[in-house]
């Protein structure tokens, strides 16, 4: 998926703002099992998934609990680091070799300060993530494992 399509899927930007944001990303490739973000670590980069699948998981009672799958077109943004300067609550791992668009969080913060359209794009992404979070977490609390996976599979369609 093209980076401009991914960006505009979240919030349509004027062409000059889109060009500025696109000019700040670079295409990278990482192998299966690579960790984009790690639990309890402050992160420095954000990613748009061009090709591939990732999962987000946390540890509970010495077990990995997967609660989100990202796929082509999704954004992997470390919101806790970006908004509060905290370590992340989850690890994000590649489930296959992936092609990603990468942007430094420091650069993203600069863009938020200097371009109101990009700042609104970031706000819109955060709003969508906040709305989606309870939907992702609820099945973890209330469903049996098989039912939970069926529900998550449904979200990926």
What are these regions (language model features)?
Residues 1-27, 31, 81:
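Cyclic nucleotide-binding regulatory module and flanking cytosolic helices
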Residues 7, 22, 41, 97, ...:
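Generic anion/oxyanion-binding catalytic loop in active/binding sites
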Residues 9, 34-95:
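Cyclic nucleotide-binding regulatory domains
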Residues 10, 39-40, 115, 156:
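Short coil/turn helix-boundary motifs
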Residues 13, 62, 114-117:
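Alpha-helical structural elements of signaling/regulatory helical domains
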Residues 27, 69, 91, 100-102:
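Conserved hydrophobic/aromatic beta-strand scaffold that supports enzyme active sites
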Residues 93-96, 101-157:
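Polybasic "coupling" helices that flank or enter modular domains
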């Amino acid at each position: 998926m093209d980076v401009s399509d991914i960006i505009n899927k979240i919030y349509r930007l004027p062409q000059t703002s889109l060009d500025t944001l696109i000019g700040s990303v670079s295409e990278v490739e990482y192998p299966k099992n690579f960790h984009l973000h790690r639990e309890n670590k402050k992160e420095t980069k954000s990613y748009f998934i061009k090709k591939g699948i990732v999962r987000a998981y946390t540890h509970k009672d010495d077990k990995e609990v997967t609660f989100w799958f990202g796929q082509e077109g999704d954004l992997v943004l470390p919101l806790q680091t970006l908004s509060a300067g905290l370590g992340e609550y989850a690890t994000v791992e590649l489930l296959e070799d992936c092609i990603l668009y990468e942007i430094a969080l420091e650069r993203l913060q600069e863009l938020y300060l200097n371009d109101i359209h990009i700042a609104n794009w970031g706000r819109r992404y955060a709003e969508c993530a906040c709305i989606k979070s309870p939907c992702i977490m609820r099945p973890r609390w209330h469903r049996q494992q098989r039912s939970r996976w069926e529900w998550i599979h449904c979200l990926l369609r």
